[in-house]
Regions:
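Acidic/polar low-complexity segments and flexible, solvent-exposed patches
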Residues: 1-69
Length: 69
């Protein structure tokens, strides 16, 4: 069983969702974590994380080199 690891971090949930969609459009499954922290504190200290399977992290990093938010 693979663990989820952080591929990217953003200040706003919409930025994280766009990144997730970009990854998924390139065949890398991703989920967004910590959106609830934004509800209570805009630009929360934790940030909003985009998570991928550990086994997909290298591919996610390769794909994100071309990502322009």
């Amino acid at each position: 069983m693979s663990d989820l690891v952080e591929a990217a971090r953003f200040n706003r949930p919409i930025e994280a969702e766009l990144c997730r969609m970009f990854l998924e459009s390139h065949g890398v499954g991703a989920v967004v974590f910590d959106t609830q922290s934004y509800i209570y504190a805009e630009g929360a200290l934790v940030g909003v994380r985009v998570m991928v399977l550990d086994e997909d992290l290298d591919e996610a990093r390769r794909v994100l080199r071309d990502y322009k938010p």
